[in-house]
């Protein structure tokens, strides 16, 4: 079991610079979520950090390239900004568990089919067997968007889009549109219905706008991610160049592959 908690409070009178939040969402496997970018829209990204096993990873391709270059340059301990934040993470706190009676209410109201209901129940059971939360809503406290709601959803599989068996789902409460980073782009996926299940059960007022898990062609999250990742790509390119220059100075005989 692995939990990060802040060990010290800021001393009185000390001006503390606000840092991007980071939340532990899976203490068993050392999974955290934190904003992709230090500024702007707080689109979450998953990271994994287990001290005992030495397993550290970030799902951002830019960060993976950054750390790969570090390893190839003889600096295997280098971490991206997202991973460094885990040292001050908010401790794990279990979200409200999904209840099957609320899912049945969704079926009764015609919000999803019996087939989708069965898919949701089966994936929920699989997450319980693995000792992890099926749906973890991501709220950045006072910085939480009143429009976009994000979820970390269990997938039960590992792939390029869910390296830690979790995917990111977003819901635009103004437009009633959903988005999931999984591969099922042309049709609604079970991950969106699981997120809707949690909202229907815990925050039904956010579903007041007519919602359709299949509708995502104008999803705001897509535009937010495009802007954020463009900015991060520029920063990452600069960071990699600086890292390469630093490593070459320290280890002139090393060669980047």
Name each region found by the language model:
Residues 1-257:
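Long, low-complexity, compositionally biased intrinsically disordered regions
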């Amino acid at each position: 079991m692995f939990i990060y908690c802040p060990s010290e409070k800021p001393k009185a009178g000390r001006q503390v610079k606000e840092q991007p939040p980071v939340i532990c969402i899976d203490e068993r496997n050392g999974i955290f979520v934190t904003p992709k970018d230090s500024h702007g829209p707080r689109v979450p990204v998953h990271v994994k950090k287990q001290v005992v096993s030495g397993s550290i990873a970030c799902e951002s391709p830019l960060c993976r390239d950054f750390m790969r270059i570090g390893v190839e340059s003889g600096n295997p301990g280098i971490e991206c900004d997202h991973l460094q934040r885990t040292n001050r993470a908010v401790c794990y706190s279990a979200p409200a568990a999904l209840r099957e009676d609320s899912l049945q209410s969704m079926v009764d109201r015609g919000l999803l089919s019996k087939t989708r209901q069965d898919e949701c129940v089966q994936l929920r059971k699989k997450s319980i067997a693995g000792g992890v939360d099926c749906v973890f809503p991501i709220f950045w406290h006072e910085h939480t968007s009143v429009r976009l709601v994000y979820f970390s959803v269990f997938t039960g599989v590992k792939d390029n889009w869910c390296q830690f068996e979790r995917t990111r789902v977003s819901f635009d409460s103004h437009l009633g549109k959903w988005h999931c980073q999984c591969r099922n782009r042309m049709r609604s996926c079970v991950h969106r219905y699981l997120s809707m299940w949690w909202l229907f059960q815990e925050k039904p007022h956010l579903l007041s706008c007519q919602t359709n898990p299949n509708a995502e062609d104008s999803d705001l999250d897509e535009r937010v991610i495009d802007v954020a990742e463009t900015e991060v790509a520029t920063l990452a390119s600069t960071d990699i160049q600086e890292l390469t220059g630093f490593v070459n100075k320290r280890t002139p005989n090393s060669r980047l592959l």
